[in-house]
């Protein structure tokens, strides 16, 4: 064997060792098998490197070892284990480091034996004719990375020089240094192009020597480019694998965060419930005495439960043990429960009769909202359009009106032909209270933003203010013995002579609209009407065709005032003549009128810049409050029954199986659609902080991520 062949075999050995050091991250256990492909290549290399001179040199290198048996030629040993023994690591780890070959490097080694070792990747031959495609070797990849490494080292030296020259001024120019570092990072991660060829000079040249020299230079650069391509492809594949792993970890962390936030919301609700219960007991003096039969019954149940748990009796089933668990809400003695509930009602009545003005007493720190939004909202982990909660058959005849205070907070709903208000916990998706008192269908409602209160307006021409905390506490008692038409209602406004169709309130004043063609302003502290606006001379019947609202939703004709909103001294109203009016509540006069709708206005809302209204004319219009002009218009195939919006999104319900969403920032429209099994139509939608709640004509309530 001549020197060139021996040099080629030695290069293979060096290449395999270096590849093991660089590719240990993707080590495969199959490399350790006795019939591995690598073992065959290594044996072939050793055989080709045989000869007396090689063995003599090898034995001389081992002559300084302590033990004589370790100085034997490693190639003559039967197992080869001693060759991989050292004082730093075990033999298995050493074997992995020294013998690993990836499939790519192995293929490169085999192809390299068949190809010209010195000409690089490309030759003046057709790859299809040769049947093989050359790939870059480890040495070529190292050679191709040298220009990038040199540039990086030079830039690092420049960066150190800049930092040292700045000295004490480094802190003052911290922002400038950050910009320089960002640019440096961007530069070192970019591909360094080596293409600088004058194509015009080639077209004008007649020198074969020049063209031949240039051809060799172009071939070298093309080889370099292909090597860079191989290296970059491997880097991209490696990054793709890492990104996939990071994505899996991200999904796992999101699921864990969802569980933690659900526990956080549940515990906050439980803490709020405990505090409200304590306030309720203290306010009405309902604390149990030490000899109260309920305490004795609880202690007895606790004792029986512990005895059953400790006895390990084989005849006691798990269900029997569960039946013995203490229950602080349900008493086994029905007579005692009824008597206790009647006693509680009696105390509540007495307490309320002693109070001169229950409405004034309500506005205190105890009734302020204590719940706050979690730091990271759950809906941020869901895709937009996801239905995250469903309450089926919340009402028998369809949802007529509703409102909620915050995502995963409290939801209040009323159904068509239903005289009661249901209160729901959106976190647990359960009903926590029920408030009765209206004599007809409840047509509008609004939850307080600062106090745990709800104001409702009904077809019975009455407005009622409800104490949500008190209603929740009384709902825990035996419903058969408690008259609920008075206890959780703080105050009733009864000056209207027609059904209440719309209401709005802020911290001080309440404004309501009625079918008696009046708008009244109320003082929420003393409960008195302080202003009345007559609409009989302003609102006239629209001459266009009237689109009737479905029977479950309304009467045979639209409301005189379909919607209103007040803020401070400003009031906006939408009426059945299709006009949207802005009022000054201090003077009771119209200051601006928005004309454009051709049918009754069903809903509206305004912020600091825009007023948006929906109408039975199948359109939504956006008005500029500063100029009074129309700034946007949306047309649909069905009448618009409900809208809501914030600075990000506008949502609307048009009586279809989906509700519409318009992204105000990206100027895009999309929709949240019911499942294929749910054919109910959505007529009501409320929206806050990317969280929407919808009500359908079959009584279903759903929560969505928007």
From Swiss-Prot:
Native species: Vanderwaltozyma polyspora (strain ATCC 22028 / DSM 70294 / BCRC 21397 / CBS 2163 / NBRC 10782 / NRRL Y-8283 / UCD 57-17)
Topology relative to the membrane: Peripheral membrane protein
PROSITE patterns on file: WD_REPEATS_1 (PS00678), WD_REPEATS_2 (PS50082), WD_REPEATS_REGION (PS50294)
Endpoints of the signal sequence: none
Pfam families xref list: WD40 (PF00400)
Subcellular location: Mitochondrion outer membrane
Annotated protein name in UniProt: Mitochondrial division protein 1
Coiled coil residues, start to end: 227-264
Ranges for the WD repeats: 394-434, 437-476, 495-534, 554-593, 596-635, 637-672, 677-706
């Amino acid at each position: 064997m001549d020197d060139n062949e021996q040099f080629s075999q030695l290069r293979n050995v060096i290449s395999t060792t270096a590849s093991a050091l660089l590719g240990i991250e993707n080590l495969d256990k199959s490399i350790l098998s006795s019939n591995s492909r690598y073992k065959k290549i290594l044996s072939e290399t050793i055989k080709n490197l045989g000869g007396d001179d090689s063995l003599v040199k090898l034995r001389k290198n081992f002559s300084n070892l302590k033990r004589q048996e370790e100085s034997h030629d490693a190639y003559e040993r039967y197992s080869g284990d001693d060759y991989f023994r050292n004082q730093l690591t075990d033999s298995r780890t050493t074997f992995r480091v020294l013998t690993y070959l990836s499939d790519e490097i192995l293929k490169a080694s085999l192809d390299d034996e068949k190809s010209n070792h010195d000409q690089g990747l490309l030759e003046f031959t057709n790859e299809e004719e040769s049947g093989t495609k050359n790939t870059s070797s480890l040495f070529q990849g190292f050679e191709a990375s040298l220009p990038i490494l040199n540039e990086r080292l030079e830039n690092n030296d420049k960066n150190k020089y800049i930092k040292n020259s700045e000295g004490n001024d480094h802190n003052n120019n911290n922002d400038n240094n950050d910009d320089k570092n960002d640019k440096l990072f961007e530069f070192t991660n970019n591909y360094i192009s080596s293409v600088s060829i004058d194509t015009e000079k080639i077209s004008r040249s007649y020198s074969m020597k020049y063209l031949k020299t240039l051809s060799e230079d172009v071939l070298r650069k093309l080889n370099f480019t292909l090597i860079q391509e191989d290296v970059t492809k491997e880097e991209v594949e490696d990054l793709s694998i890492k990104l996939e792993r990071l994505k899996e970890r991200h999904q796992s962390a999101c699921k864990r965060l969802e569980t933690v936030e659900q526990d956080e919301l549940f515990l906050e609700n439980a803490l709020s419930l405990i505090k409200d219960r304590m306030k309720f007991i203290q306010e009405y003096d309902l604390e149990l005495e030490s000899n109260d039969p309920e305490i004795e019954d609880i202690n007895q149940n606790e004792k029986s439960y512990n005895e059953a748990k400790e006895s390990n009796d084989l005849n006691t089933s798990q269900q029997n043990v569960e039946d013995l668990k203490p229950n602080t809400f349900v008493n086994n003695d029905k007579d005692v429960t009824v008597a206790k509930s009647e006693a509680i009602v009696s105390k509540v009545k007495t307490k309320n009769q002693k109070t001169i003005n229950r409405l004034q007493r309500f506005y205190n720190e105890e009734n302020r909202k204590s719940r706050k939004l979690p730091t990271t909202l759950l809906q941020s982990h869901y895709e937009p359009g996801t239905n995250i909660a469903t309450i089926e058959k919340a009402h028998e005849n369809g949802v007529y009106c509703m409102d909620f205070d915050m995502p995963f907070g409290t939801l209040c709903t009323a159904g068509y032909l239903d005289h009661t208000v249901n209160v729901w916990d959106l976190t647990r998706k359960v009903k926590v209270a029920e408030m009765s008192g209206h004599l007809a269908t409840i047509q509008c409602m609004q939850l307080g933003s600062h106090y745990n209160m709800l104001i409702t307006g009904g077809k019975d021409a009455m407005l009622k203010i409800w104490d949500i905390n008190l209603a929740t506490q009384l709902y825990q008692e035996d419903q058969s013995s408690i008259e609920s038409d008075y206890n959780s209602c703080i105050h009733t406004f009864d000056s209207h002579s027609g059904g209440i169709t719309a209401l709005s309130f802020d911290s001080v004043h309440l404004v309501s609209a009625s079918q008696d063609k009046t708008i009244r302003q109320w003082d929420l502290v003393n409960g008195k009407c302080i202003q009345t606006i007559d609409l009989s001379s302003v609102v006239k019947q629209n001459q266009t065709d009237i689109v009737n609202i479905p029977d479950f939703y309304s009467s045979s004709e639209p409301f005189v005032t379909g919607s209103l909103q007040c803020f401070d001294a400003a009031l906006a109203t939408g009426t059945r003549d299709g006009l949207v009016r802005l009022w000054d509540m201090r003077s009771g006069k119209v200051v601006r009128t928005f004309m454009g709708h051709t049918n009754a206005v069903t809903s509206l809302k305004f912020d600091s810049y825009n007023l948006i209204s929906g109408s039975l004319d199948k359109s939504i219009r956006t008005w500029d409050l500063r100029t009074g002009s129309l700034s946007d218009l949306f047309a649909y195939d069905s009448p618009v029954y409900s809208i809501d919006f914030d600075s990000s999104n506008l949502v609307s319900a048009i009586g279809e199986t989906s509700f519409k969403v318009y992204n105000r920032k990206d100027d895009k429209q999309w929709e949240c659609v019911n499942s294929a099994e749910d054919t109910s139509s959505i007529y009501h939608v409320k929206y806050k902080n990317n969280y929407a709640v919808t009500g359908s004509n079959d009584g279903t309530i759903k929560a969505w991520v928007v």
